Amino acid sequence: MSAPVEVAYLGPADTNTHEVARALFAHASKLRPLSTIERVFDAVEQGEVPFGVVPIENSIAGTVRETVDALITGSLRIAREHELAIRHTLAARPKVTLRDVRRVLSKDQALSQCRRWLDAHGPDWERIPSTSTAQAAKDVLSDPEAAAIAPPLAVKNLGLSVLCDNIADRDDNATRFVVVAREDSPPSPRAPGAPSPDKTSLVFVAPHERGGLRKVLGVFDDAFVNLTRIESRPLVGLHGPRWEYAFVVDAEGHRLESPLREALEGLDAMGALVKVLGSYPRALASVSHALDLSQARPSS
């Protein structure tokens, strides 16, 4: 990923996804915001761009189903992941103070994740859902009685005043983003005997028989493969029969290396339906927003 490339991401600009795309592709010749996750996948699949950046999981809200479903039904693979600690900032146009605010705008998820703070400090404020946190930030520029719950990138780029920073009800809010491409990543370098720094995401359908799921999980256990995440997904929305489920799994290791390679061979031998969604370097920890809001306009 060293040569200049064009990269698509779930827009609009100045969102958390935009910040992640900038961090991962600082060399990109162009970052292209697209309106939906489906559109990002289409752009990569059709060769318009080599990479796309989309959210896949939030530590509070859970899985982003549109991303997972697109990976299951499409041809793209995960090539990289990035975790971002989410920071919700209450901001308004310059010279607006908390006493002026009569309504607060943001994406519905952000409003819900800041509910306790809003109940305590703005119980009478009208809470207005917006299409995105970045759009909310733009909308308050023309409204002297409005504040937005917005990401730091939007606050900085739009020159908003910070009314209060870090207003989320929980301080462990993080979102996991993935880079999707036509190929996943090769195995990462490591010292002999060192654990793999890679992660593999896959989906499987267990044999439709008594103990089928237990048998599949037993294959991973027998191969000493650690599963870091497992989630069921109804097949009915994926052109499958009603009341049957696929299981989306994150496993330590790379699909081309032992012991995960042997586990995948074992699943194939037992007749389990398996699709690898990608092997890629594991994100070691959530990364806080790189932006410094100390230069943003303070407000009382």
Regions found by a protein language model. Give the residues of each.
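Domain-level signature for soluble enzymes in the chorismate/prephenate branch of the shikimate pathway
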Residues: 1-300
